[in-house]
Amino acid sequence: MAAKDVKFGNDARVKMLAGVNVLADAVKVTLGPKGRNVILDKSFGAPTITKDGVSVAREIELEDKFENMGAQMVKEVASKANDAAGDGTTTATVLAQAIVNEGLKAVAAGMNPMDLKRGIDKAVAAVVSELKALSKPCETSKEIEQVGTISANSDSIVGQLIAQAMEKVGKEGVITVEDGTGLEDELDVVEGMQFDRGYLSPYFINKPETATVEMDNPYILLVDKKISNIRELLPVLEAVAKAGKPLLIIAEDVEGEALATLVVNTMRGIVKVAAVKAPGFGDRRKAMLQDIAILTAGTVISEEIGMELEKAALEDLGQAKRVVINKDNTTIIDGVGDEAQIKGRVAQIRQQIEESTSDYDKEKLQERVAKLAGGVAVIKVGAATEVEMKEKKDRVEDALHATRAAVEEGIVAGGGVALIRAASKAAANLQGDNEEQNVGIKLALRAMEAPLRQIVANAGEEASVVASAVKNGEGNYGYNAGTEEYGDMIAMGILDPTKVTRSALQFAASIAGLMITTEAMVTELPKDDKLDPSAAMGGMGGMGGMM
């Protein structure tokens, strides 16, 4: 086991604080409408330019191991805020730095760290409940656009695109961000349920100009097995032919004689059929077939529940207004499923999302919710260079997370104002169990001014003057650093999602409290692997006369 280096008390805290400040100082220059960029060197390819706090934090590793421990703990604050709300990483870092700096000053003055931490925790709990009281629901498209614009660093086009996307696919719909091909940002919307399986034979195509299969008011047969024997399908095919409607077959696979017969019947015009493979694999495929069944008011023909394909009747088939199939995707538009059943299924999947521990599973479950709830929107980010594209994509993803958070928990006044208002309301009723807890409460409430001060400092104004003016105001009165004006922040469209502000404060206080109560730090001593240069050159003494 390697030897360890141990530091105690003030020595440890000084080192830790130095690390905290290096990381936080690099991150906080990005805060606010006039925040600057940070350039990150990459071991390969062009450097990355970003205004995303968590991207900056993730890049920082310090040479001094004790300082690095401090930096890594603040990095954890940014990462946690990013995971919880998808935004607010810079705010969380600024708050953590302020609480740690104030807290360690109090510890150095002889205060009890545990009581300070208890005071900080009390202050944060009170401020969080005040934030919830200040919060108002984010319902209109205009508010969603404003939240998106602020989070994308005042890029109004991004805000508009996100608002349009949410309007089209609903607040539950999936919105993804992809690289565009031109200079302009674009929005593509896929309505209905789309899954990544195309037609099993190009002979099903009935729209040669677009190489697609299009069906109006089709029946949809859902089968949880491979179909290779046409005899199993004949009763359903005859019933559908009599009804005079097209048929879409979604099965594990359709092959051999069965596929050949379907193709021949389609080409002769006897019955209009198309077949696609069911999406997903294993249990996920079964779940997705069930989703499609609920969406189209059909039944999955599965031998597991004693159903046989030969005995399937028209009432077992699902229906939709329209189906479009190309070589890669199938889209079912306007399934006739019962609204209450669809909502019940969505609620069931949401419960699974809550219980799931895997990010991959959560993402797949979220996709299923979106497909049931209304559609998928793709924002294609346009830029002149790849470096700009990466930077812009980061901002769009941040804005998207922020708008989702706003829809979930509502919005508060932005620009650091909500924290100041919540802190002043909380201060009126807060009392610690002893004087040292009161000091903890006061330092936490004082630290909550830090985001506003940093936004103002980044805009080149005097932070103390603006902070004093905002504190003396009421309600949503604050300072718009973009236009350098005072006024009603919500009326000016400067909004923050409540969830982002709340998460930033809670994670910052949690990690800062742990750092304030640190009394010793342990790290490995560096290994001394370097050779002694004089020993390495010892055998070359006879070369002296050659110079």
Curated annotation (Swiss-Prot):
Q: Does the keyword Isomerase apply?
A: yes
Q: Which InterPro entries match?
A: Chaperonin_Cpn60_CS, Cpn60/GroEL, Cpn60/GroEL/TCP-1, GroEL-like_apical_dom_sf, GROEL-like_equatorial_sf, TCP-1-like_intermed_sf
A Gene Ontology biological process noted in the UniProt record is: protein refolding
Pfam families referenced in this protein's UniProt entry, alphabetically: Cpn60_TCP1
**EC?**
5.6.1.7
Q: Which UniProt keywords apply?
A: ATP-binding, Chaperone, Cytoplasm, Isomerase, Nucleotide-binding
- Report the leader peptide range: none
Its chief place of residence is cytoplasm
Q: Where does ATP bind?
A: T30, L31, G32, P33, K51, D87, G88, T89, T90, T91, G415, D496
Q: Which GO terms describe its molecular function?
A: ATP binding; ATP-dependent protein folding chaperone; isomerase activity; unfolded protein binding
> Into which EC class is this enzyme placed?
isomerase
A GO CC annotation given for this chain: cytoplasm
Concerning NCBIfam families, the annotation shows: GroEL, PRK00013.1, PRK12849.1, PRK12850.1, PRK12851.1
Q: Note the subunit structure.
A: Forms a cylinder of 14 subunits composed of two heptameric rings stacked back-to-back. Interacts with the co-chaperonin GroES.
Task: Provide the function of this protein.
Answer: Together with its co-chaperonin GroES, plays an essential role in assisting protein folding. The GroEL-GroES system forms a nano-cage that allows encapsulation of the non-native substrate proteins and provides a physical environment optimized to promote and accelerate protein folding.
* Protein family according to the UniProt entry: Belongs to the chaperonin (HSP60) family.
Q: What is this protein called?
A: Chaperonin GroEL
**Which species is this record about?**
Actinobacillus succinogenes (strain ATCC 55618 / DSM 22257 / CCUG 43843 / 130Z)
